[in-house]
A protein has these predicted regions:
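Amphipathic alpha-helical protein-protein interaction segments
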Residues: 12-175
Length: 175
């Protein structure tokens, strides 16, 4: 991904421009004159994963830029993009169901998910505003939500597999 290469080279503006272009290209109603604009959550869009990735990537770029230059506006923008990524992820998960599995999401966005919690914690540490503390908890809760959905899907598959429940419980005890 070109934008990630820009982040690695500490070229944050071109990285953000790249991620913003990705959003503009897949959301017909979204127009942005700068890299700070965040589009509304999309209820129906065939490019859900591109949208989620662009939000997480913008958050990562703003966080890296903050860590380099200590501009609090960059930290705020990182948080806004992480929030948008999580909200889009929930809408997408509800729309797609099993096709958007927790292992796929965690594998694809693990670093960004961890950085989102770090971002909220840094904002809380800098401002002591309880809202940012709530954001950190909210991000952790959303990660737990993905874990619960994955566990429910595994349980449903086990119930529909024809395997007697007592054997499944024995297997659990063996683990």
């Amino acid at each position: 991904d070109r934008g990630k290469l820009f982040i690695d080279k500490r070229m944050y503006r071109p990285a953000l421009e790249d991620f913003q272009r990705a959003l503009i290209s897949v959301i017909p109603s979204f127009e942005a004159n700068d890299n700070f604009a965040v589009p509304e959550i999309q209820n129906e869009n065939p490019y859900f994963l591109t949208i989620i990735a662009a939000h997480f990537n913008k958050g990562d770029a703003f966080l890296a830029w903050f860590n380099r230059e200590k501009n609090p506006q960059h930290l705020e923008q990182a948080l806004r993009n992480y929030q948008a990524a999580y909200h889009q992820l929930i809408v997408t998960r509800n729309a797609m169901g099993d096709e958007l599995s927790k292992p796929f999401l965690m594998g694809t966005f693990q670093k960004s998910i961890e950085q989102s919690v770090t971002c909220a914690r840094q904002l809380y540490g800098a401002t002591h505003n309880a809202r940012y503390f709530q954001d950190a908890f909210h991000f952790v809760e959303l990660t737990k939500y993905l874990n619960v959905l994955d566990a429910l899907q595994r349980a449903e598959r086990a119930n529909n597999s024809g395997i007697p429940k007592n054997l499944l419980l024995e297997l659990k005890d063996v683990r």
